[in-house]
Amino acid sequence: MQLKRSFFIMAFAISALTIQVPIFAADAELPVVFTEDFEKGSDSWEILDPNTWKLSERQGNSTLEITKRKSEYQPEVRSPRHIALIKDVEVEDFELTFKVRSTKDTGNHRDCCVFFAWQDKTHFYYSHLGAKPDPHSGQIMIVKDAPRKALTTNETRTPWTDKWHHVKVTRTASTGEIVVYFDDMEQPHMQVSDMTFKRGRIGIGSFDDLNEFDDIVLRGK
């Protein structure tokens, strides 16, 4: 009887520890450091070519939109031309979510870009959500004093339509892990690990296409 009682107490203790694990994980969720719905304008953004972006309103909802494919911003090395960076925020670990609508079908390289660990105009990562992947489209890229270079060999198409889509990008600086999601928030669209850059700024945009953005939430530290 004593042996059975001791076993029961031990099993209960182990069970209690197991139950507490998800609670600990929830507590570890990164804090929200920035949100944007553009209802009060775009003053929180540094736009590298303001003449190709505008605030738009449809049915009472405000968005930020790229309106011209050609940009006056000409980067020193081959890399995206439409870039809007969040002001006064730098993160190392982060989770970025937002809605995006591609407003022009430009074919295989129809895209949206997400910028992160931005140091300056020639040092940063970006995710290129191109419709058809190749070495210059549909990959996680690095810019480091040279034209953009793919870190991934992704072969999964980005299924653009004219409707709104959901994007999530996560980064764990301690391991270098970068994970990108498109519509399906459980199954990664592409992922890689790289330790070149850690803390930096976050941005949205496109290589040279037209997009509309809304409902941006950045969690990070």
What does each model-identified segment do?
Residues 145-166:
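Short, aromatic/His-centered strand-loop micro-motif at the edge of beta-sheets
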Residues 42-72:
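Extracellular glycan-recognition surfaces and repeat-rich motifs
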Residues 9-22:
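Bacterial N-terminal signal peptides
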Residues 190-215:
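Flexible glycan-contacting loops in extracellular carbohydrate-active proteins
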Residues 26-50:
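Extracellular carbohydrate-recognition regions
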Residues 74-143:
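Secretory/extracellular carbohydrate-interaction modules
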Residues 38, 98, 162-173, 178-180:
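Short tryptophan-centered beta-strand motifs in secreted/extracellular beta-sheet-rich domains
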Residues 82-89, 152-159, 202-203:
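Beta-strand-rich interaction surfaces with strong enrichment in secreted/lumenal proteins
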